[in-house]
């Protein structure tokens, strides 16, 4: 195995977020309010199963322990179960997770688990069906809730739920969310609304700091948990009276980037060192054949030397991220 991926600031990278499509069937207000529109940036289409196998094999050789499949909506790919199985072939990958809108969860989650999926994140921005419809553009609240139940029935011990925190939309609904997770092993993760190139107006209207929720959780006796090396960026809190947990993802907080442990590859095979970086490094020409793995690993390692110490969101610089469906949020 090659040496562990480490950048110029001594950060080690154990976690790959791999987008497999930028297509999504939801129209979330903070991501794709006008729905998915093909970009026309490639004539080769999205990464194939073989290309996904090769890129994850290279990252595993460089010390990656966790792969999260993202989109767009990953489950819209007809070969999604085959993709999970391809990643699972590598024993060095200890965790394979997916971030999904839950649209196909009830129908397919048992098959995903059988293929090797170990973790699920479901996007749920409101527990009110009408508000859920207003945010997502889809009247699928009950279907998504049934999907979460199906995940537990399929054998997942915990489900993570992602909730984008928005002022005057859901920031005042903490008690409703807490009641929901009191007897369910759900890690509910509130994610601060992030500014993107297409979402500046929405950001100015609805952004609120997660500090507000953190202060309230601590006041109520919630306890901050230690972070593991392949965990995502959430600050996780638990409470003895709750089966569930609360996570807070606050990218505008000081030192947020100090614990960065993840890299991103887009659905067309570009490596991104940061969600809000300025550009990507093409890997696809080195995904055509198994004999290219050494060159692929070298390109990844060299690219990492250019990773910046921090993002520049505080300067309203969102890089190339026009919306979060492009490189998987």
UniProtKB/Swiss-Prot annotation:
It comes from Shigella boydii serotype 18 (strain CDC 3083-94 / BS512). PANTHER family: GTP 3',8-CYCLASE, MOLYBDOPTERIN COFACTOR SYNTHESIS PROTEIN A. PROSITE patterns: MOAA_NIFB_PQQE, RADICAL_SAM. Its EC number is 4.1.99.22. It is an enzyme of class 4 (lyase). Keywords: 4Fe-4S, GTP-binding, Iron, Iron-sulfur, Lyase, Metal-binding, Molybdenum cofactor biosynthesis, Nucleotide-binding, S-adenosyl-L-methionine. Gene3D superfamilies: Aldolase class I. S-adenosyl-L-methionine binds at residues 30, 72, 123, 194. Belongs to the radical SAM superfamily. MoaA family. Pathway: Cofactor biosynthesis; molybdopterin biosynthesis. GO terms for molecular function: 4 iron, 4 sulfur cluster binding; cyclic pyranopterin monophosphate synthase activity; GTP 3',8'-cyclase activity; GTP binding; metal ion binding; S-adenosyl-L-methionine binding. Its cofactor is [4Fe-4S] cluster. GTP binds at residues 17, 68, 99, 160, 262-264. [4Fe-4S] cluster 2 binds at residues 257, 260, 274. InterPro entries: Aldolase_TIM (IPR013785), Elp3/MiaA/NifB-like_rSAM (IPR006638), MoaA (IPR013483), MoaA_NifB_PqqE_Fe-S-bd_CS (IPR000385), MoaA_twitch (IPR010505), MoCo_biosynth_MoaA/MoaC (IPR050105), rSAM (IPR007197). Binds 2 [4Fe-4S] clusters. Binds 1 [4Fe-4S] cluster coordinated with 3 cysteines and an exchangeable S-adenosyl-L-methionine and 1 [4Fe-4S] cluster coordinated with 3 cysteines and the GTP-derived substrate. Pfam families: Fer4_12, Mob_synth_C, Radical_SAM. Catalyzes the cyclization of GTP to (8S)-3',8-cyclo-7,8-dihydroguanosine 5'-triphosphate. This is GTP 3',8-cyclase. NCBIfam families: moaA. Monomer and homodimer. Residues 8-234 form the Radical SAM core domain. The gene is moaA. It catalyses: GTP + AH2 + S-adenosyl-L-methionine = (8S)-3',8-cyclo-7,8-dihydroguanosine 5'-triphosphate + 5'-deoxyadenosine + L-methionine + A + H(+).
